[in-house]
């Protein structure tokens, strides 16, 4: 189905409207490349929301306490911490520039008052600690209040330093740097359910790391052929199972997914399960292999299903059924007739991500023209919504959009020929427990929530 039906995307069977909550970022027409958002991620509680951009910065938003005095106040997200995660580098051995762009952010489950996250660019992964400080020590023996050393001859009494209140300060400090393990560009990182290890994947290899050890990683997948001329596919995404710490999956540019069990062997070159949908020979074309390349793979929270995103669709797979997906949701089927021009302008290589809602009953992914799509798995209804400042009045309901692929266009429909392919939503995130979503549109972060009447 091209376009959307229905008035909103339900997350359990009851329809509700999505409405505008907030938008972050400048309104400028000319957007600096460094300001373009490249990843979005809620933490496990949903109280923190992190974004990374092409300039190597990480911005963390914190949800404010709900204001009981204001009707329908749901708690807004405001800037909590901003820090430079990665800087541009140069590999002198290979004469290559290494971009500072943040490819992925992954939160670690919170163990104490501090928060920890992993961020990665093409080559280097960093573990960051985000902590608060609202007290400072005063009354040192050897230093004065400004930090200057005191004259030892003037120190006549022993002082015990005391803690005094100060304005709240949020500090982001790098605790570990994991480098020099990837020859190719890192496309995925995933924290294991044991909370001690994580994996990182590039085009040809997947490495397993311990969070405490930076100088050693274990290569668990290596698909690099002895002769690079024989290379037929690359790894596009990888993720650990949410509950079984020995199981992970990785997807390929050929549209296949391999599930591996680390208990079987140290090097998981032989998969435990192989997921692939048979190709329909009648629909084979020059673009078939390009559009079948998987750009994202995500396990459901339950661990029973996984979702993959290719160029035109989202597929849901049952881990017990390798032969075909149990669900196929068409994201923008109306673009199938435009593949030639999308190939010429390189849009056909765009990597769209996808995400589940907290109960695994709905899924979300992005499209062009700042549209994003939602699919309800229970009712089989879907909706197309738009992230736009034109709808940015507080509590304004999002109006479902429809795309017309030809013939007579109705009043509220948009022609496929008038879609703006420079405006694309590649990165989205869904709050783990509530109906709150975050959508990255170029340099702006939109936050939407369900409308409570």
UniProtKB/Swiss-Prot annotation:
Residue segments, region Disordered: 385-406
SUPFAM superfamilies the record matches: WD40 repeat-like
Phosphoserine found at: 285
Any single GO CC term annotated in Swiss-Prot or TrEMBL for this entry: cytosol
MF-aspect GO terms: enzyme-substrate adaptor activity; protein phosphatase regulator activity
Gene3D superfamilies: YVTN repeat-like/Quinoprotein amine dehydrogenase (2.130.10.10)
Keyword hit for Cell wall biogenesis/degradation: no
WD repeats: 32-71, 97-138, 181-219, 230-270, 289-327, 344-385, 420-452
Compartment list: Cytoplasm
Modified residues (Phosphotyrosine): 305
A biological process from GO: cell division
Keyword Cell division among UniProt keywords: yes
Domain of life: Eukaryota
Keywords noted in UniProt: Cell cycle, Cell division, Cytoplasm, Mitosis, Phosphoprotein, Repeat, WD repeat
Modified residues (Phosphothreonine): 308
InterPro entries assigned: PP2A_PR55, PP2A_PR55_CS, WD40/YVTN_repeat-like_dom_sf, WD40_repeat_dom_sf, WD40_rpt
UniProt note on tissues of expression: Widely expressed with high levels in brain, heart, placenta, skeletal muscle, testis, thymus and spleen.
Biological role: Substrate-recognition subunit of protein phosphatase 2A (PP2A) that plays a key role in cell cycle by controlling mitosis entry and exit. Involved in chromosome clustering during late mitosis by mediating dephosphorylation of MKI67. The activity of PP2A complexes containing PPP2R2D (PR55-delta) fluctuate during the cell cycle: the activity is high in interphase and low in mitosis.
Family to which this protein belongs: Belongs to the phosphatase 2A regulatory subunit B family.
Subunit structure: PP2A consists of a common heterodimeric core enzyme, composed of a 36 kDa catalytic subunit (subunit C) and a 65 kDa constant regulatory subunit (PR65 or subunit A), that associates with a variety of regulatory subunits. Proteins that associate with the core dimer include three families of regulatory subunits B (the R2/B/PR55/B55, R3/B''/PR72/PR130/PR59 and R5/B'/B56 families), the 48 kDa variable regulatory subunit, viral proteins, and cell signaling molecules.
Protein name: Serine/threonine-protein phosphatase 2A 55 kDa regulatory subunit B delta isoform
Organism: Rattus norvegicus
């Amino acid at each position: 189905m091209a376009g959307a039906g229905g008035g909103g995307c339900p997350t359990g069977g009851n329809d509700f409207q999505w409405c505008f909550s907030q938008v972050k970022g400048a309104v400028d027409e000319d957007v600096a490349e460094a300001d373009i958002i490249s990843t979005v991620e809620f933490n496990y509680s949903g109280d923190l929301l992190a974004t990374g951009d092409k300039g190597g910065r990480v911005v963390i938003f914190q949800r404010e306490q709900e204001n009981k005095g204001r009707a329908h106040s749901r708690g807004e997200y405001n800037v909590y911490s901003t820090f430079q995660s990665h800087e541009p580098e140069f590999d002198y051995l290979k004469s290559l520039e290494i971009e500072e762009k943040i490819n992925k952010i992954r939160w670690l489950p919170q163990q104490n008052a501090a928060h920890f996250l992993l961020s990665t660019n093409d080559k280097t992964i960093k573990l960051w600690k985000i902590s608060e400080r609202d007290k400072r020590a005063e009354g040192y023996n050897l230093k004065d209040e400004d930090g200057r050393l005191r004259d030892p001859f003037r120190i006549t009494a022993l002082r015990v330093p005391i803690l005094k209140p100060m304005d709240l300060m949020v500090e982001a400090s790098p605790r570990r740097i994991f480098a020099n393990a990837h020859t190719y560009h890192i496309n995925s990182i995933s924290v294991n359910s044991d909370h001690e290890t994580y994996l990182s994947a590039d085009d040809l290899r997947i490495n397993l790391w311990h969070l405490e050890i930076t100088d050693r990683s274990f290569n668990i997948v290596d698909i690099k052929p002895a002769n690079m001329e024989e290379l037929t596919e690359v790894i596009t995404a990888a993720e650990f199972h949410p509950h079984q710490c020995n199981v992970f999956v990785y997807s390929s540019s050929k549209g296949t997914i391999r599930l591996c069990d680390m208990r079987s062997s140290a090097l998981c070159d032989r998969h435990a399960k192989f997921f692939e949908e048979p190709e329909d020979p009648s629909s084979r074309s020059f673009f078939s292999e390009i559009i079948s390349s998987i750009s994202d793979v995500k396990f459901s929270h339950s661990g029973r299903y996984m979702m993959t995103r290719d160029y035109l669709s989202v597929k849901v797979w049952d881990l017990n059924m390798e032969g075909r997906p149990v669900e196929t949701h068409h994201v923008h089927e109306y673009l199938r007739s435009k593949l030639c021009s999308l190939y010429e302008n390189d849009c056909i290589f765009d990597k769209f991500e996808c995400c589940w809602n907290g109960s695994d009953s709905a899924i979300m992914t992005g499209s062009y023209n700042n549209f994003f799509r939602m699919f309800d798995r229970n009712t089989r209804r879907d909706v197309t919504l738009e992230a736009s400042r034109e709808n940015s009045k507080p509590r304004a309901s999002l109006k479902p959009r429809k795309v017309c692929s030809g013939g007579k266009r109705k009043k509220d429909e948009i022609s496929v020929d008038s879609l703006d392919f420079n405006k694309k939503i590649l990165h989205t995130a869904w709050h783990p427990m509530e109906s709150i979503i975050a959508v990255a549109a170029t340099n702006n972060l939109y936050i939407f929530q369900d409308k409570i009447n």
